[in-house]
Amino acid sequence: IGSGLVGSEMCIRDRLIIILQFAIKRSSRNHKSRNQQFLERESRANQVRRKDISNLNYISIPDNLPLINSGNETFNQLLSNNSGMMRSYNTITGLKDKKILNLTGISNTELKLSYGAANLTELTEYDDNFTTLIKAIASLGHALIDNNDTADALSFLEYGISIGSDISSNYIDLAIIYAATDRFDDIRKLKEKAGMLKSLSRDNIIEQLNNMLK
C-alpha cells in the first residue's frame, strides 16, 4: 500500500510538472507575441509623418479666475502670507501663455500614430503643462478651503474639473463645498464626470463621492 501511495503521489507530481511546464511555455509564447505586436506597432508609429496639431483641443486659463491685486483683499492677504499658495498661484498664471493639452490615457505610441513621431516632444510638453496645472489648482484650492476662503476655492476647483483634472482632492474638496450648501445634485454631476476619467484614481474618487451622497 505504501509503495502504491508513493507511486500515486509521484504520478500526480509529474502531471503537475507537465502542466506547469506547458503553462510557462504558453505564457512565454503569449509574451513574445505581445512584444512582437508592440514592436511592429511602434515601428509603424515612428514612420508616421508630422501632422497639423494646431487645431487640437488646447486648454486656456480664463481671466475670470481670482487674481491678486484685483480688489479681492481676502485673496490678496492669504497669498501674501502663504508662500505655498503664492507658488501654486504663480504656477497657474505662468502657464497662461503656454500650450496645454490633456492627453491622459493616451500612450506615446498612440500619439505618434495619430500625430506623427516628430510631434511627440511637443505633445509631451503640452501634457506635462496640463499635469503641472491641475496639481497647482488642486493645491491652491485645498489651501484656500483650509483658510476659509471657499468662494475663491470654488472658482479654482470648478475650473480644474472643467478641464478634466483627475486629482482626487480636486473632486473631494469641491464636493465638500457643495455638501456644505446642500448642493447634492452637483455632487452627483461630479460623480458622472469622474466616471469619464481614464485614470487609476477614478474608482477611488467615485467611492468617496458615493460616501458623501449617503
What are the language-model segments listed below?
Residues 1-7, 11-12:
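Single conserved hydrophobic/aromatic residue that forms the stacking wall/gate
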Residues 19-122:
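N-terminal topogenic membrane-targeting module
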Residues 136-137, 171:
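TPR repeat positional signature
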Residues 169-170, 204:
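TPR alpha-solenoid repeat register
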